[in-house]
């Protein structure tokens, strides 16, 4: 069969292909939480030899332990303790990285009740030692994620000791939007390179 220029064969596009073409890349579309997406991002950085950043284990308080056997101990009652520092830490190009991650379904502000005084103190201590410290803030309803330097968070917290929510306008003015992707899903190192180190990790 000869296909003349005035009558080209049109390739059929299935509804699924149309959906995949126009759908925004978002970890939520894969049924992932914000935390899981960050963990996957860190695993990507580690596998590629880019950075070594891990989630800190949540501390627990053991209340009751049973000993069914002399050589075995079984925890039967425990509860999570309030974290004294931040969620993640590690190293990238010789720089100490330390950050917290928060998510909200609100559209106009990030609740400051999500941050505790000892976490703010920890971030200030990291900055004093010249570490790179920040928070990743995800607005689930808006599908927007921001990198906010720790100094901007600390400055806002000190206004009224964290009793009011942080407006999205403040975050946009003092932070940087993280464009979500596939590999990695939450490419926050892009912000560190572009805004603070002036290079490119690729």
Curated annotation (Swiss-Prot):
GO biological process: chromosome segregation; DNA recombination; DNA repair
InterPro entries referenced in this protein's UniProt entry, alphabetically: Resolv_RecU, Restrct_endonuc-II-like, tRNA_endonuc-like_dom_sf
The species this protein was found in: Streptococcus equi subsp. zooepidemicus (strain MGCS10565)
Family in the record: Belongs to the RecU family.
Gene3D superfamilies, alphabetized: 3.40.1350.10
Functional summary from the UniProt entry: Endonuclease that resolves Holliday junction intermediates in genetic recombination. Cleaves mobile four-strand junctions by introducing symmetrical nicks in paired strands. Promotes annealing of linear ssDNA with homologous dsDNA. Required for DNA repair, homologous recombination and chromosome segregation.
Name the record gives this protein: Holliday junction resolvase RecU
Gene Ontology CC annotation, any one: cytoplasm
Domain of life: Bacteria
Top-tier EC class: hydrolase
């Amino acid at each position: 069969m000869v296909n003349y220029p005035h009558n080209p064969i049109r390739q059929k596009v299935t509804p699924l292909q149309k959906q995949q073409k126009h759908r925004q890349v978002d970890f939520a579309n894969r049924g992932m939480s914000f935390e899981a997406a960050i963990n996957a991002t860190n695993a990507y950085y580690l596998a590629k030899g880019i950075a070594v950043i891990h989630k800190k284990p949540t501390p627990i308080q053991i209340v009751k332990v049973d000993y069914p056997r002399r050589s075995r101990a079984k925890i039967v009652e425990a509860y999570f303790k309030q974290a004294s520092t931040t969620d993640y830490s590690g190293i990238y190009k010789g720089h100490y990285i330390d950050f917290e991650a928060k998510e909200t379904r609100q559209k106009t502000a990030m609740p400051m009740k999500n941050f505790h005084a000892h976490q703010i103190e920890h971030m200030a201590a990291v900055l004093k030692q010249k570490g790179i410290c920040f928070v990743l803030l995800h607005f689930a309803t808006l599908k927007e994620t921001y990198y906010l330097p720790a100094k901007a968070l600390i400055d806002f917290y000190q206004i009224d000791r964290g009793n009011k929510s942080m407006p999205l306008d403040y975050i946009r003015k003092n932070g940087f939007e993280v464009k979500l992707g596939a590999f990695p899903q939450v490419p926050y190192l892009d912000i560190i390179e572009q805004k603070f180190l002036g290079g490119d990790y690729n």
